[in-house]
Amino acid sequence: FPAYDVEHGEAIFFNQMNAYREVDKNFLVREVIRASTAAPTYFPVAKLNNQSKEESYSLIDGGMFANNPAFCAYVEACKFPFQPSPDDIMILSLGTGSKGKTYPYESSKRWGKVRWVVPVIDIYGSAGSQTVDHQLKVLYRCQHIRDQYFRIEPDLSQFDVSPLMDNVSTKNIKALEAVGEKMVEEHWDKIKAFTRKLYISQIGCQPDEFYRMK
């Protein structure tokens, strides 16, 4: 889980390995989730204390620097003691959706500082997310590794939904659930292939063979 410490001015990464190794890196999961999703203007800064109460952080949403944290997850996985290679790491990256906003040249060329505020935030988030997706695709492709990384990112402009984070109306929640179901339907073959490969890597046999042995 990525988050940003505004008091110390640094990116923080929470993971299980650190929690097991060091008591001052052990935090309650609910508090880590609260901190890593504390989006400015939507939620207040989260004050997070570790289990020993000896260290604290003042945290905001990790999306401020890692809107798509897939590469962060990859790097954290590389820290395991057995030093995994890309061939040992499988990543299913799930995006929350993009509106695919564009800004025509004729209008944007006349914008001033105030008019650019919202577009800059939108571009920063979407471009950063796309960059991570591109980098991971190239990383796996250059290693000649197939079917171990893929990303699902719905284009919300194709659906009747609101992308606003604070729109929690029943209608919008149901619409977003429908988008999720549609994405599963569209990517079902890839999801099956991915989960099957993951299963084989962990169990050592095909899922149907495992259940026959049971």
Q: What is each PLM-predicted segment?
A:
Residues 1-214:
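Conserved catalytic cores and adjacent C-terminal regulatory segments
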